[in-house]
């Protein structure tokens, strides 16, 4: 228990700072906002609140609120641990679902881009750019699509967390306040989405990587189209990195909960889960800070060179 608390004390504050870094820079710089980075922004919000669970866990530990147990009964659960368990389930699912929507987004945009390249329609060929009515229509389409993503993610998380709460299944667990009982069937409300999202994300990533390896930019395309295709490719790779981080950092939690359900010794995975899940937000912030778009923007802010036409520099922006 003390080892877990120590891990939370080290990892959680760093990860929360990482999430805030993404949130603040996204809000400050319009050039970082596009149809893909919207997903990164909302995942960062989910990460921030989910990681704050670990700060609350530390506080509960030092004020002696029970939250670590392998008991299967939830009859003695205090309201504080119950509330933290519900909070954790909601934002944990939000982190998972926003990661999954990134997978869907990059898969859809990649094959949408392939169709546009085949038609060689340069004028309407950008994700968030263009001109005149095409730009306005495209932005309206993006806004409507994002609304559906919001409805899916937040609606799913609310229903998922509420059903478990109504059934009074939140309480102390091996890693803090969550769903009580290692072999509690209600844990499949967490495991099934994890199994599904991790499996489909791996399959989609492999398919896209194979396609990207086979596809080669055409030197016959106009300069602007070539630059756009390169930038679009860079941004898809960035989104894929976020998806890969989700797979890597949530895999230990998936293995842990699966082993717990079957009653297998899992001390190593308890500690690994504490490290990986609490550090996911930090890993996301590192990908965000090292992206070509962010680095170019920061370079221009620091060097302060005028007339660099940032509107044309990143054509994939809205």
Swiss-Prot record:
Disulfide bonds: 81-177
BP GO annotations: adenylate cyclase-activating G protein-coupled receptor signaling pathway; cell surface receptor signaling pathway
An annotated Gene Ontology molecular function: G protein-coupled receptor activity
TM spans (from-to): 4-24, 39-59, 84-104, 146-166, 188-208, 235-255, 268-288
Keywords, sorted A to Z: Disulfide bond, G-protein coupled receptor, Membrane, Receptor, Transducer, Transmembrane, Transmembrane helix
Keyword Cytoplasm: no
Keyword check for Transmembrane helix: yes
Cytoplasmic side: 25-38, 105-145, 209-234, 289-318
Pfam families membership: Dicty_CAR (PF05462)
Extracellular topology ranges: 1-3, 60-83, 167-187, 256-267
InterPro entries, per database record: GCR1-cAMP_receptor, GPCR_2-like_7TM, GPCR_Rhodpsn_7TM
Membrane topology: Multi-pass membrane protein
Main location (coarse class): membrane
Localization: Membrane
PROSITE patterns: G_PROTEIN_RECEP_F2_4
GO cellular component: plasma membrane
Function according to Swiss-Prot or TrEMBL: Receptor for cAMP.
Recorded family membership: Belongs to the G-protein coupled receptor 5 family.
Protein name: Cyclic AMP receptor-like protein F
Species assigned in the record: Dictyostelium discoideum
Name of the gene encoding the protein in the UniProt record: crlF
């Amino acid at each position: 228990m003390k080892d877990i608390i120590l891990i939370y004390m080290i990892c959680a504050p760093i990860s929360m700072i990482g999430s805030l870094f993404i949130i603040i820079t996204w809000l400050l710089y319009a050039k970082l906002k596009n149809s893909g980075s919207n997903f990164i922004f909302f995942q960062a919000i989910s990460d921030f609140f989910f990681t704050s669970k670990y700060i609350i866990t530390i506080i509960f530990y030092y004020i002696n609120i029970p939250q670590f147990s392998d008991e299967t009964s939830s009859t003695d659960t205090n309201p504080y641990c119950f509330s933290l368990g519900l909070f954790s389930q909601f934002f944990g699912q939000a982190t998972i679902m926003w990661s999954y929507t990134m997978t869907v987004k990059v898969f859809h945009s990649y094959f949408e881009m392939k169709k546009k390249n085949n038609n060689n329609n340069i004028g309407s060929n950008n994700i968030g750019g263009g001109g005149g009515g095409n730009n306005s229509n495209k932005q309206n389409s993006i806004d409507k699509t994002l609304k559906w993503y919001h409805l899916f993610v937040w609606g799913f998380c609310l229903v998922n967390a509420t059903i478990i709460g109504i059934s009074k299944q939140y309480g102390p667990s091996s890693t803090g306040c969550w769903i009580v009982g290692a072999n509690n069937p209600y844990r499949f409300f967490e495991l099934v989405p994890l199994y599904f999202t991790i499996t489909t994300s791996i399959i989609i990533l492999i398919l896209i990587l194979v396609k990207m390896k086979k596809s080669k930019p055409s030197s016959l395309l106009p300069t602007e189209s070539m630059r756009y295709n390169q930038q679009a490719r860079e941004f898809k790779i960035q989104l894929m990195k976020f998806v890969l981080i989700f797979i890597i950092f949530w895999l230990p939690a998936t293995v842990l909960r699966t082993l717990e359900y079957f009653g297998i010794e899992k001390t190593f995975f308890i500690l690994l889960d504490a490290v990986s899940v609490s550090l996911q937000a930090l890993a996301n912030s590192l990908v965000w800070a090292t992206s070509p778009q962010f680095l170019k923007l920061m370079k221009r802010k620091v060097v302060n060179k005028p007339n660099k036409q940032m509107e044309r520099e990143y054509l994939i922006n809205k």
